[in-house]
Amino acid sequence: MQQESERCRVRARRPDMALYVPKARRGAVLLKTGDEEESCGSPNSVVKEKQKESSLSQKEVFKDKPEARRLNINPDRKEHNCREEKKSSTKLRMDTCLQKTNRVCSKRGTTESKEVLSQGQQQGAPNAGVITNAPLQRHFKPKKVECLEVETTDVTGHERILLSQACLEISEAQVPSKPFQNVEFCDFSRHEPDGEAFEDKDLEGRIETDTKVLEILYEFPRVFSSVMKPENMIVPIKLSSDSEIVQQSMQTSDGILNPSSGGITTTSVPGSPDGVFDQTCVDFEVESVGGIANSTGFILDQKDTDSIPATMGHISLSESTNDTVSPVMIRECEKNDSTADELHVKHEPPDTAVLAHETHRDSGFKNVGDITNKACMMDTTGMSCSDHVTVDSPYVVAVRIADETSINTRSFSKFVGMSADATPLHVARSGNDTEDFSNPSACSDIYGESISSHFTESTGKLIESLSDCASSLPIKKIAGSNYNTFLDSELSMLNGTKVLSDSAVGIDLGSTGDTTEALHELRTAEEFKTEEQDDSGSIEFGVSFPDRESSSMETSIEPKATETSHTEGITAIEESWESMFNDDGDCLDPRLLQEGILMHIKPENHCSKLSGNTKSRESIQEPRSDYYNHEVPDIDLSDCEFPHVIEIYDFPQEFHTEDLLRVFCSYQKKGFDIKWVDDTHALGVFSSPITARDALGIKHTMVKIRPLSQATRAAKAKARAYAEFLQPAKERPETSAALARRLVISALGVRSKQSKTEREAELKKLQEARERKRLEAKQREDIWEGRDQSTV
């Protein structure tokens, strides 16, 4: 009976197995959620709260379960029990959903922590002695995860680092040795992409480290390596940046400067578009650097060349005529005075001695007069001394004295040049001297065999710093020289004015003073020539430069002549159009008026002589028509029978209606029509007599026009016969589709099939067209009246 009663007793309905959690596994679920929270690197407060709520709900369910059993014993409360069970099942479902969401959140947190910690492990430098013994979480999910504490250089403190792809082999080897009692298998498909992501992260970390190294290298682009050899070899230099400029300097340990022979060496820079060129054009050797610093100049002597050129060019930096010797350039740079001296020497023909003397004076000298420059040409006896040149053939002397003081930045430059065949010489000036010194202090032409010299001295503020400077150039006549040779050289110099002017202008094209200097040199050369011709004995020219303080007029004839010629040149330059002409354009200079009259008279006399007529005729052609008093005759069309009709005649027979319409195309909009009379006559019908009168005023090359009162009889008869067809032409109104449809419907009496919406759209378009037309008319009126259109 007891068994039957147990069978008949209503049992409590068990919850669904999918939502049921056995007692043995209830604690495991709680432990699992706790472990998953610990495995997450950065704990989340929201996840903790959800887990607490889930655990509390589970406890409440377990507490309510015995009460539900007690209630189920009573059969009268069956419905109530069903409701209770439904509520409990819904609670269990909610709890399981919360647990699943907690698992997903914890898994996401673990994957994020894995990615962060793997990146930190790759960027940092972990200790090599750390060996992992925990199973890999990619394949297995243990309940208790052992986290390793690894100290890195980049991270301060201890961090929990989960294993990544780098320890895959070690972990797989150690997994089978552990028991599988408390291990649950996870979904492999869910974790395999994580492993791939770890591999990608590893690659990205390596690339980032490589780029960091490159960035560190690029932060110092100016670091480059160069090799200086004791043999002064030029070594190519590699740069790590494209924008750097290679600067090479040659140093020696022995203090001896031995430049290599002339040539151009190219240093190739990788990555840069252009090469860097170092040019060395030195063909001599200097024994010691200390000697260079202490010496005041260099003397270069060249001999044994092969051929003599016919003419000698300007003294400048250029190659020789026979291309046997390269140009020479010497540059000195001193740090104390920050001065630079340049010496340019042109190689001359054989048996030519070139003296290039360059003195350097700095602020240490109080009196510049202590350094004097003298160049004396004595008899050709072979004797030589300091600052003197004695040769027995045409020679060139080029002396340049540059003075750049630290107090006064201006410079005092001299240039003495002597060349065969009356070679014009340049006037040397320094780069700091920007003023136009057009007044030469001295200009001398020296008697010698094919020798001419010019000596110029800049004035102005330079004299203040060089007040005590006095230089003289005494030159004695050679006893056994040829006088005719000198005359030839003087004549060639006088005739070669173009060469002299070109050489003077070539120094500085921007200043007009150089041109005047060339003229002054030419005039002084003429004066020296006359003096030389008058005196046949031994002549000595002395050019002296007085001090600024001395007021005595101890100057020679040559400076006076140059001053007078200089003033004449200034007056010639100062003549301008304003001084010669007034505001009305009349000439104020009577001399120019006389020249103009003579210039006009001479061509007339010449023409009269050629034609044989001594009388000058007046050939003025009178105009045939008076263009100033031209008036359009007023045409009266009131007497005409048809004032709006005109006759068109005298046009080619090949003309058609289109051709006549093209002639009167401007009247077609207002209304114009053509009625033919014969092949050369037609009637033009206009919209009004005013338009017809306007058309009569036009001129056309192919057609002629006249009113109908002056027309031929045939034209008048045609007009009377077709009087009803010659009504004034009316302008065609602007039509639209809506207007045409309305006209057709009204004429035929047919009902329109157009809907109301289409009719409203057409009316709207018509209104927009009217508004647009009104605005255009208003804008046209505003333009004519000159009103502002911004308000429109």
UniProtKB/Swiss-Prot annotation:
Coiled coil: 751-783
Location of region: EJC-binding motif: 7-27
Modification Phosphoserine occurs at: S688
UniProt keyword annotations, A-Z: Coiled coil, Phosphoprotein
Gene3D superfamilies recorded: 3.30.70.330
Positions carrying Phosphothreonine: T712
UniProt keyword Lipoprotein present: no
Region (Disordered): 32-61, 527-567, 772-792
InterPro entries linked to this entry: Nucleotide-bd_a/b_plait_sf (IPR012677), R3HC1/R3HCL (IPR039884)
Keyword Coiled coil appears in the UniProt entry: yes
Superkingdom of origin organism: Eukaryota
Tissue expr: Expressed in placenta.
Subunit-structure text: May interact with the exon junction complex (EJC) composed at least of CASC3, EIF4A3, MAGOH and RBM8A.
The name this protein goes by in its record: Coiled-coil domain-containing protein R3HCC1L
Gene (name only): R3HCC1L
